[in-house]
UniProtKB/Swiss-Prot annotation:
UniProt keyword annotation of Methyltransferase present: yes
Protein name: Ubiquinone/menaquinone biosynthesis C-methyltransferase UbiE
GO molecular function ontology, one term from the record: demethylmenaquinone methyltransferase activity
HAMAP family for the chain: MenG_UbiE_methyltr
Length: 251
């Protein structure tokens, strides 16, 4: 049992040692990698594609720019950014999990996306890039899995160019109480069953539901981004606040 609360963190509803969380999260994503895209469509009824499209639209990414798609997984955002930045630009798809990174690389190469995409296994808390490297950073449904979110946000701030922007797309807190109750019922009762049927892994999708509940709400995450140095931070609620897109700038 860990007694020092400064050395513990949350893994879903469990309290675990900080040094254990990364390995526990890694096991979740090793387990779900092969069925990740299928489960995304099933879990969100395909709406995740609209959330990601809105993120792309809010990114302001242009031809020739350099983008970091952090926790990029199977590369949905990277595919879009690759076309936007063109041959003169670059997209780095980074993920801490090698199984997810492998799935992303194979998926993008199979649809002909090569040349301006680089793949890097990286921890968001200690990004292996020089200061002032990227015009835009996105992290999509990944921040809640990070052990030290404040450290990760500071790391993202460091590698952004002045004038660059960070976009955090993440599950958040529904703004309507009836929706909140229905969402809880879906997340804790239906979602694990779907995970068991499709991915043969109810436990990983139970963790998903729990990790969403433990993630900071909209205003708390906004304050965390401000504390990390970002300015003009705002957010957009989507699907009643089930998901929120936060955007902040480095000036």
């Amino acid at each position: 049992m860990v007694e020092d609360s400064q050395d513990t963190t949350h893994f879903g509803f469990q309290t675990v040692a900080k040094e254990q969380k990364a390995d526990m999260v890694a096991q979740v994503f090793h387990s779900v990698a092969a069925k990740y895209d299928v489960m995304n469509d099933l879990m969100s009824f395909g709406i995740h594609r609209l959330w990601k499209r809105f993120t792309i639209d809010c990114s302001g990414v242009r031809r020739g720019q350099k983008v970091l798609d952090l926790a990029g997984g199977t590369g949905d955002l990277t595919a879009k950014f690759s076309r936007l930045v063109g041959e003169s630009g670059k997209v780095v798809l980074a993920d801490i999990n090698d199984s997810m990174l492998k799935m992303g690389r194979e998926k993008l190469r199979n649809i002909g996306i090569v040349g301006n995409v680089e793949y890097v296994q990286a921890n968001a808390e200690a990004l292996p890039f020089p200061d002032n490297t990227f015009d835009c950073i996105t992290i999509s449904f990944g921040l809640r899995n990070v052990t030290d979110k404040e450290k990760a946000l500071r790391s993202m701030f460091r590698v952004l160019k002045p004038g660059g922007r960070l976009l955090v797309l993440e599950f958040s807190k529904p703004v309507f109480e009836p929706l909140n109750k229905a969402y809880d019922a879906y997340s804790f009762h239906i979602l694990p069953r779907v995970g068991e049927l499709v991915a043969k892994d109810a436990g990983s999708y139970r963790y998903l539901a729990e990790s969403i509940r433990m993630h900071p709400d909209q205003e708390t995450l906004k304050a965390m981004m401000n504390d990390a140095g970002f300015e003009n931070v705002n957010y957009y609620n989507m699907t009643g606040g089930i998901v929120a897109l936060h955007r902040g700038y480095k000036f």
